[in-house]
């Protein structure tokens, strides 16, 4: 048995757009403005970030149609450089990237949902954490029930967040037509000339563009992936780039620099200045955006763990699917459990600082693998074949992106590297070591879990999808 191909072109576009447009564009686009120090330069950096992300997404489109396995960078690194480096990538995602990002998104959703009830103070800690936990559990149930349920939820919430941003953009255009153009006069005045500051501004923009690889996590479930994967990317990336630039133009038309930099939620401040009695809709839009982003993150992460288990890098139980619903329920439940554990960490937002280096390192390594496979397997069928200029330029830029956190946030970056390297002994003891030499209690425990899962929950192991 295998996962069913149920993700259409429209679903693919919704997954990419829904994951890329999270809370960032509503809450904290000021990161780019802080380091660029001018409206004009900040818009240029948003455009550069969009172009860079388009190049990366196109490279992933070639990889996804050449290596038709789910798992995104994990699958591509495994194919190019072998199991050890792929496991370290998987271990980093399991231990820090996926559960941390999902916990943060869920908490942000909960805070914006209950904020109207506590207009003059922070929402209670326990209330926001319980709502966040309920959100994660509900989305896990939806995606466990049917793949179509998860994609329909994604479609609805993607439409909602795009509609909210269109409202902001139209409001900004109206203000510009009314003569609110003072912030765009001499818009490059005061621009930062510090290479380090410009680098950090670009890094902030690229953080908001992250998520363009979402569809590559579910390649095996896409209908006609040779067509729909690259087409979904080609449609999604310009949409997000244009929306981001126009949304920032709208913010700049209404708010001066001091107001933007002082705001904890720029979209909410914008709504307070322009939407009057309807300003309450924007916090709700932020919550909906977080909900949709969390859903796409859960879909992607569960497939990553599913593929990792199928490759023998995680327990076999996680590679099972329901015999009737064709959903990777054990992987979804495992992902849910990890996210719930991280909800108990009081300063979970601090954990985000640990994985910027690892994220870009493994993305760059995936695309370096694209170049390597061109040399190693030149005759391999490639439904989409880009000029080598694209992956080479992207890899050179990733060297810069990996160097930035080492320079600007050395301690947190070193902690992130240590977290990744903690997977080395796990790999050699649990995977590289022959099964006969592993502790018998571990082998028996994993076998018992697999049998229990099969016999009591109607799950079966899946076959490897080897179609290239």
UniProtKB/Swiss-Prot annotation:
Answer yes or no on keyword Iron: no
The record ties this protein, via InterPro entries, to: AA/rel_permease1 (IPR002293), AminoAcid_Transporter (IPR050598)
How does this protein sit in the membrane? Multi-pass membrane protein
Any GO MF annotation of the entry: arginine binding
Q: Where are the transmembrane segments?
A: 7-27, 41-61, 77-97, 130-150, 162-182, 198-218, 229-249, 274-294, 326-346, 348-368, 386-406, 414-434
Cellular component, GO annotation: plasma membrane
Q: Which reaction does it catalyse?
A: L-lysine(out) + L-arginine(in) = L-lysine(in) + L-arginine(out); L-leucine(out) + L-arginine(in) + Na(+)(out) = L-leucine(in) + L-arginine(out) + Na(+)(in); L-glutamine(out) + L-arginine(in) + Na(+)(out) = L-glutamine(in) + L-arginine(out) + Na(+)(in); L-histidine(out) + L-arginine(in) + Na(+)(out) = L-histidine(in) + L-arginine(out) + Na(+)(in)
Name the principal localization, coarsely classed: membrane
Q: Which PANTHER family match?
A: AMINO ACID TRANSPORTER, Y+L AMINO ACID TRANSPORTER 2
Q: Which family does it belong to?
A: Belongs to the amino acid-polyamine-organocation (APC) superfamily. L-type amino acid transporter (LAT) (TC 2.A.3.8) family.
Please give the name of this protein. Y+L amino acid transporter 2
Q: Which organism is it from?
A: Danio rerio
Which taxonomic lineage does the organism of this UniProt entry have? Eukaryota, Metazoa, Chordata, Craniata, Vertebrata
Name of the gene: slc7a6
């Amino acid at each position: 048995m295998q996962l069913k191909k149920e993700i259409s072109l429209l679903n693919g576009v919704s997954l990419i757009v829904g994951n890329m447009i999270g809370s960032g564009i509503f809450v904290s686009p000021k990161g780019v403005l802080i380091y660029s120090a001018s409206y004009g330069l900040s818009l240029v950096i948003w455009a550069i970030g969009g172009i860079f992300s388009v190049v990366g997404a196109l490279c992933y489109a070639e990889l996804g149609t050449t290596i038709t396995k789910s798992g995104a960078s994990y699958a591509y690194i495994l194919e190019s450089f072998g199991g050890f480096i792929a496991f370290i990538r998987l271990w980093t995602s399991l231990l820090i990237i996926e559960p941390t990002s999902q916990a943060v998104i869920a908490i942000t959703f909960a805070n914006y949902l209950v904020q109207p009830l506590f207009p003059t103070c922070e929402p209670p800690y326990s209330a926001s954490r319980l709502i966040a936990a309920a959100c994660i559990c509900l989305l896990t149930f939806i995606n466990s029930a049917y793949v179509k349920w998860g994609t329909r939820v994604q479609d609805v919430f993607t439409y909602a967040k795009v509609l909210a941003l269109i409202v902001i953009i139209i409001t900004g255009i109206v203000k510009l037509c009314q003569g609110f153009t003072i912030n765009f006069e001499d818009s490059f005045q005061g621009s930062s000339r510090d290479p380090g500051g410009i680098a950090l501004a670009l890094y902030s923009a690229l953080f908001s563009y992250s998520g363009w690889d979402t569809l590559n996590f579910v390649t095996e479930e896409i209908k006609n992936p040779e067509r729909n994967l690259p087409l979904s990317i080609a449609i999604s990336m310009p949409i997000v780039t244009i929306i981001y630039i126009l949304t920032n133009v709208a913010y700049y038309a209404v708010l001066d620099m001091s107001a933007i930099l002082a705001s904890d939620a720029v979209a909410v401040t914008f709504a307070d200045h322009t939407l009057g009695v309807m300003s309450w809709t924007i916090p709700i839009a932020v919550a909906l955006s977080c909900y949709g982003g969390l859903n796409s993150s859960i879909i992607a992460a569960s497939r990553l763990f599913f593929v990792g288990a199928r490759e023998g890098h995680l327990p076999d139980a996680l590679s099972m699917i329901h015999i009737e619903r064709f959903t990777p329920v054990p992987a979804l439940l495992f992902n849910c459990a990890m996210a719930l554990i991280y909800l108990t960490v009081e300063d979970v937002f601090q954990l985000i600082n640990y994985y910027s280096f690892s994220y870009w390192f493994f993305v760059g390594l995936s695309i370096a693998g694209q170049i390597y496979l061109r040399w190693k397997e030149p005759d391999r069928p490639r439904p989409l074949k880009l000029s080598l200029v694209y992956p080479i330029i992207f890899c050179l830029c990733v060297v810069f992106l990996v160097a930035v956190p080492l320079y600007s946030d050395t301690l947190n970056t070193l902690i992130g590297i240590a977290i990744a390297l903690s997977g080395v002994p796990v790999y050699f003891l649990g995977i590289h070591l022959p099964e006969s030499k592993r502790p018998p209690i571990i082998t028996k425990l994993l076998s018992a879990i697999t049998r229990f899962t099969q016999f009591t929950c109607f799950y079966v192991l899946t076959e490897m999808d080897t179609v290239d």
